[in-house]
């Protein structure tokens, strides 16, 4: 089964979910993308610095991650799409993402850029990923 995690910039939430899912799941594969990967947060850049450091402290190397812009094909190719949202993104999301029939929404509030807030979001995402792995393998 292919799981696609999506967030705005593919620098923290969706990237973290992808890395944790791929570490925990033995049968399934995850990837991630952002629906607004443009400008200085552009495609091909790595994860946020704080996120990289937090993962490194936990024994995970995410330095090879490169931000990717979400495409309709990515959604078509996925069996499950998980939007790791920070709030009400529904008004700015592509229609084809919402109407795919594959999309689940995990709301992980907060856009603060402190180490403590990043760590708290990673803990929440980690719990949600564990639940998904327990559900699908």
Describe the residue ranges of each PLM region:
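Mid-chain, well-packed structural core segment of small domains
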Residues: 65-96
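Structural signal for conserved beta-strand scaffold positions within catalytic alpha/beta enzyme cores
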Residues: 32, 83, 104-107
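Short glycine/proline-enriched coil/turn segments at helix->beta-strand junctions
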Residues: 25-29, 77, 99-102
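Phosphate-binding/catalytic loops
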Residues: 89-137
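Conserved active-site segments centered on acidic
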Residues: 1-71
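Generic alpha-helical secondary structure signal
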Residues: 49, 73-76, 116-123
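N-terminal/domain-start segments enriched in small and hydrophobic, helix-friendly residues
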Residues: 1-5, 75-76, 126-134
